[in-house]
Structure formats: C-alpha cells, structure tokens
C-alpha cells in the first residue's frame, strides 16, 4: 500500500508527518501576509511574534499550535488558501 493511500494517524506514530516542516511553512505564509501591501490589524501582532520566535529560539510548531486561531484570522483576512490548508493539516496531524 502506498504512503498516500495510508491515513496518517498521529496517535499511532509521527513518522512521515513532518510537523516541523509544516510549521515552518505556516510561518512562511504568515510572512507573506504581513509583507502584503494590504495591512491588517494582525500585521503588527505577527511581526512581534516572529521577532520573539527568533529572539527566544522558540519551537515553531509550539508557536503555531498556540496561535492557531489568530493565524487562521490572519489567513482568512488575506484569503491565503495555502496557509489555511496547511493550518488545517497541522491541526489534524500534529496538534
């Protein structure tokens, strides 16, 4: 059976899930949004958060998991479909 045909279940194993990579990609999507010409009320908030992550060496997956609702609001505001899809995947597979 191919890897694609197997439903990934985080309660069995994290093998093949790549949660850290997914979290890094979500942070890239956040950067896309805050660099967009159309600013949102979330821009300054996430600029500070991204600075904190770097300064404090925080775990990216932890940050994404603890900010899910705020990240979702940012992505919805910007219509960032890729970011929303990644966020849903992280919630399902990693959190």
Curated annotation (Swiss-Prot):
User: Could you tell me which NCBIfam families the record lists for this protein?
Assistant: N2Fix_CO_CowN
- Name of protein: N(2)-fixation sustaining protein CowN
Species per Swiss-Prot/TrEMBL record: Allochromatium vinosum (strain ATCC 17899 / DSM 180 / NBRC 103801 / NCIMB 10441 / D)
Q: Which UniProt keywords apply?
A: Nitrogen fixation
Q: Which HAMAP family match?
A: CowN
Role this protein plays: Is required to sustain N(2)-dependent growth in the presence of low levels of carbon monoxide (CO). Probably acts by protecting the N(2) fixation ability of the nitrogenase complex, which is inactivated in the presence of CO.
* InterPro entries linked: CowN (IPR024899)
Task: Give one GO biological process term.
Answer: nitrogen fixation
| The gene coding this protein | cowN
User: Which lineage?
Assistant: Bacteria, Pseudomonadati, Pseudomonadota, Gammaproteobacteria, Chromatiales
The family assignment reads: Belongs to the CowN family.
């Amino acid at each position: 059976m191919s890897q694609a045909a197997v439903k990934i279940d985080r309660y069995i194993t994290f093998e093949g899930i790549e949660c850290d990579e997914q979290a890094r990609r979500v942070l890239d999507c956040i950067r896309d949004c805050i660099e967009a010409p159309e600013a949102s009320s979330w821009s300054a908030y996430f600029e500070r958060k991204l600075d904190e992550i770097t300064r404090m060496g925080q775990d990216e997956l932890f940050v994404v998991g603890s900010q899910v609702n705020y990240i979702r609001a940012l992505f919805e505001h910007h219509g960032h479909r890729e970011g929303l899809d990644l966020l849903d995947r992280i919630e399902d597979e990693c959190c």
